[in-house]
A protein has these predicted regions:
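Cleavable N-terminal export/targeting peptides
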Residues: 1-37
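Short glycine/proline- and aromatic-enriched beta-strand/turn motifs that initiate or cap beta-hairpins
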Residues: 22-70, 74-82
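Short loop/turn motifs that connect adjacent beta-strands in outer-membrane beta-barrel proteins
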Residues: 24-40, 84-96, 111, 128-136, ...
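Residues that define the transmembrane beta-barrel architecture of outer-membrane proteins
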Residues: 39, 69-75, 113-119, 164-170, ...
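Transmembrane beta-strands of outer-membrane beta-barrel proteins
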Residues: 41-47, 96-100, 119, 134-142, ...
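Residues on the lipid-exposed face of transmembrane beta-strands in outer-membrane beta-barrel proteins
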Residues: 45, 75-81, 121-127, 140-144, ...
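Transmembrane beta-strands of outer-membrane beta-barrel pores
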Residues: 47-53, 81-83, 102-108, 142-150, ...
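Extracellular loop and loop/strand-boundary signature of outer-membrane beta-barrel proteins
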Residues: 61-65, 107-110, 156-162, 198-202
Length: 203
């Protein structure tokens, strides 16, 4: 059987990053005013409903429930940093940020598949500006996912798609980014997610 767990097509992504200045709660001093801001910190929340590429009969009804399933949902909490606008990297890459994310995934069949949690690094960058506050962006994620329920002859015999409890997590997304306020933005787009154990173990 195939070594990959599932391939997901995310239909929408909602992100609310909020830059936080490290000295915003302090009274400005001459030194702080003169010193360039090295990093801008961001917090993000992504909600991604999606659909599975049903490449195995397990998704088409050959499972314990005897029902087809293909809907997915993931929720991600992200921390990112961006180089300050007065730094060399900030001037060269003004619309790029990177960080770490934690994602919860459900395939609405936790009894046989599990509800994996992904821990990953990511980078988000602009492709092109479409308007003053609207741009076309991309993002990639790479990490590990935990909490799968793999094939077991006794307890999980129908699951022919999950071979490992831990699998790689890979995502690539294309999205529109709308900066509707100085410290807030909203993104929506499509993404492709792949879970894999690299053929290290088969059901």
């Amino acid at each position: 059987s195939a070594s990959f767990v599932a391939v997901l097509l995310c239909l929408t992504v909602v992100s609310l990053p909020a830059p936080v200045r490290g000295e915003s709660l302090r009274r400005p001093t001459p030194d702080s005013l003169a010193r360039p801001q090295a990093l801008v910190h961001k917090l993000g929340l992504d909600v991604s409903p999606g659909a599975l590429f049903r490449t195995d009969d397990f998704f088409k009804g050959a499972n314990a429930a005897g029902k087809e399933f293909g809907a997915t949902l993931s929720v991600h909490l992200k921390y990112a940093f961006q180089f300050g606008p007065e730094t060399r990297f900030g001037r060269n890459y003004p619309f790029t940020y990177q960080g770490v994310g934690l994602g919860y995934n459900t395939f609405f069949n936790s009894a046989e598949v599990g509800t994996p949690v992904a821990l990953y690094v990511f980078q988000h960058a602009r492709i092109a500006a479409l308007a003053e506050r609207l741009s076309l962006d991309y993002e990639w994620n790479f990490g590990l996912s935990f909490g799968w329920k793999p094939f077991d002859e006794q307890t999980n015999p129908f699951n022919t798609v999950v071979g490992s409890k831990i699998n790689a997590y890979i995502n690539l997304g294309l999205m529109l980014n709308w900066r509707f306020a100085p410290r807030w933005s909203l993104t929506a787009g499509v993404g492709l997610t792949h879970f894999s154990n690299g053929n290290t173990r088969y059901p």
